[in-house]
């Protein structure tokens, strides 16, 4: 399989240098003898990729998405050779490389450049389009019944929640949606504190949590217009949720939300009333649903 088939296409190549990769075998780090290339690039989704390529095959073998301040590239001082390590502070990943550039004098400068590119602020060329698409989606949600809205909010222990919510023949009521959000936040909606900053959209958009909704609520019909023709089955949706491009977009949205790089007013959200956390963002959506439901009742 070629790299273009296995990995996303890069929008911009920021840095490349020749380096082989190494593998950890017990307590020893063993070099891979192949000619390699380290590439720092920006993907179409706006995220920074740290890649390793086999130079002879011109194929990408390793592709790591790195967020600012998530990883450090540095020399392994315990080795007398030109060995470097990319280590992540978010988990226990440690990737080793050995320099193949002819001049060792340039290693320090390359190391500095790697860290500079990995830790620069993210840029999202399509952010305005993404925001517009999500805003349109929210507007459409306002016209639907609240069962469709609840289908996008997934929480632990959801099976029991869904069975309760769907026990009647009517649509999901606002109180049901509020109860789901209460379980998500670990307390009454509206009390979102700093402890909620650890919640990511990826934590709630998991296949094992989405499946009960696909089985109990009319979510598939709601999503079918956004999926390729003939790919709107529950299995297709679950496959999409696990695909690298989707997970990358979810991680990217979580990141720009947490760091305040997104304009909440584009979603009809007053930033003075909510925090830049996933939990607070969901709370804002719940408040929007509540307001729109009241307006609909007043009109009727």
UniProtKB/Swiss-Prot annotation:
- The protein's gene is named RPN13
Q: How does it assemble?
A: Interacts with 'Lys-63'-linked polyubiquitin chains. Interacts with DSK2a.
Q: Which organism is it from?
A: Arabidopsis thaliana (Mouse-ear cress)
Which lineage do the record's taxonomy fields give for this organism? Answer: Eukaryota, Viridiplantae, Streptophyta, Embryophyta, Tracheophyta
Q: Name one Pfam family in it.
A: RPN13_C
Which family is it part of? Belongs to the RPN13 family.
Q: Where is the Pru domain?
A: 9-121
Q: Provide the primary localization.
A: cytoplasm
The family database entries (PROSITE patterns) matched by this protein are listed as: DEUBAD, PRU
Q: Which InterPro entries match?
A: DEUBAD_dom (IPR044867), Rpn13/ADRM1 (IPR006773), Rpn13/ADRM1_Pru (IPR044868), Rpn13/ADRM1_Pru_sf (IPR038633), RPN13_DEUBAD (IPR032368), RPN13_DEUBAD_sf (IPR038108)
What PANTHER family does its record include? ADHESION REGULATING MOLECULE 1 110 KDA CELL MEMBRANE GLYCOPROTEIN (PTHR12225), PROTEASOMAL UBIQUITIN RECEPTOR ADRM1 (PTHR12225:SF0)
Where would I find the PH domain in this sequence?
13-120
Disruption outcome = No visible phenotype.
What protein name is recorded for this chain? 26S proteasome regulatory subunit RPN13
């Amino acid at each position: 399989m070629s790299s273009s088939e296995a990995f996303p296409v890069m929008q911009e190549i920021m840095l490349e240098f020749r380096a082989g990769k190494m593998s950890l075998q017990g307590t020893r780090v063993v070099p891979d003898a192949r000619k390699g290339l380290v590439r720092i690039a920006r993907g179409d989704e706006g995220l920074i990729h740290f890649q390793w390529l086999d130079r002879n095959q011109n194929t990408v073998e390793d592709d790591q998405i790195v967020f600012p301040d998530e990883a450090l590239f540095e020399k392994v001082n315990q080795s007398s050779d030109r060995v470097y390590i990319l280590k992540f502070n978010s988990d226990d990943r440690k990737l080793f490389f050995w320099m193949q550039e002819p001049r060792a004098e340039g290693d320090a400068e390359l190391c500095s450049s790697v860290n500079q590119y990995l830790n620069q602020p993210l840029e999202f060329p399509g952010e305005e389009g993404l925001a517009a698409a999500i805003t349109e989606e929210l507007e459409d949600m306002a016209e639907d019944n609240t069962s469709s809205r609840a289908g996008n909010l997934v929480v632990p222990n959801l099976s029991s929640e869904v069975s309760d919510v769907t026990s009647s023949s009517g649509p999901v009521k606002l109180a049901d949606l509020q109860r789901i959000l209460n379980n998500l936040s670990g307390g009454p909606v509206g009390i979102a504190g700093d402890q909620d900053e650890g919640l990511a959209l990826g934590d709630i958009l998991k296949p094992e949590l989405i499946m009960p909704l696909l089985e109990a609520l009319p979510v598939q019909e709601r999503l079918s217009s956004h999926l390729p023709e003939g790919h709107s089955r529950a299995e297709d949706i679950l496959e999409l949720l696990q695909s690298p491009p989707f997970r990358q977009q979810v991680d990217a949205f979580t990141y720009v939300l947490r760091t305040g790089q997104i304009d909440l007013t584009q979603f009809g959200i007053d930033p003075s009333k909510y925090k830049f956390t996933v939990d607070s963002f969901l709370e804002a959506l719940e408040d929007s649903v509540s307001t729109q439901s009241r307006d609909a009742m007043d009109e009727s």
